[in-house]
Regions:
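Acidic/aromatic-lined carbohydrate-recognition and catalytic surfaces
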Residues: 1-188
Length: 188
């Protein structure tokens, strides 16, 4: 069975790993299906294609369910309600991404405000276990977004060629954006 999560019906303009995904998994179990084939679950790049990704390892943050963030206390009911997009036969990528990006940023801030104990331990362990790709990815995304996601070879030459001083400066300049990207991958 080939179904990408973005194809699930949902109220947020694009399918995600929320209730509709759970319903689909239940359906697969009830019908004794043993394989669920998906397109890549990585962040989409140009043209919103899952085959044009910025990473082979990262998860697409737009698959994070606002309803699950509500359950975790990272979004309020009114905030998730404001994300609702009237149903359509096509995905309104730009509108869905715009609304979800703002909500994910807010949820991330709440996550960091309350971070401590076991959750902090799990978060730090996640960063350590995935550091071989995650550290470069979060920096790339933070710098990339500041460059309107233009190709990296059009960025400032020092950061594009990974000069140590430019990397250090970028880590300070984009500290908040980097924190957001770490959380997005942890939450995914």
């Amino acid at each position: 069975t080939l179904v990408h999560p973005t194809s699930f019906p949902g109220k947020y303009g694009i399918g995600d790993f929320g209730q509709e995904a759970r319903i689909f998994l239940d359906f697969l179990e009830e019908t004794e299906q043993s394989i669920w084939q998906v397109l890549p679950l990585t962040p989409t790049g140009y043209g919103n294609s899952p085959y044009a990704s910025y990473s082979a390892f990262a998860g697409n943050p737009y698959l994070i369910s606002p309803d699950i963030l509500l359950e975790k206390g990272l979004l309020t009911a009114s905030e998730t309600h404001s994300l609702i997009i009237p149903s359509s036969t096509t995905v309104a990528y730009e509108l869905a991404f715009e609304k979800k990006a703002a909500a994910l940023k807010l949820a991330s801030a709440r996550f960091y405000e309350t971070l401590g104990g076991d959750e902090e331990e799990k978060f730090e362990r996640f960063k350590l276990e995935h550091g071989h790709w995650l550290d470069d990815y979060v920096l790339f995304m933070a710098v990339g977004k500041s460059n309107q996601m233009r190709p990296w070879n059009t960025w400032d030459a020092d950061i594009a060629t990974r000069k140590k001083s430019a990397i250090s400066k970028a880590k300070k300049t984009y500290e908040q954006e980097i924190k957001l990207e770490y959380w997005l991958q942890y939450e995914f």
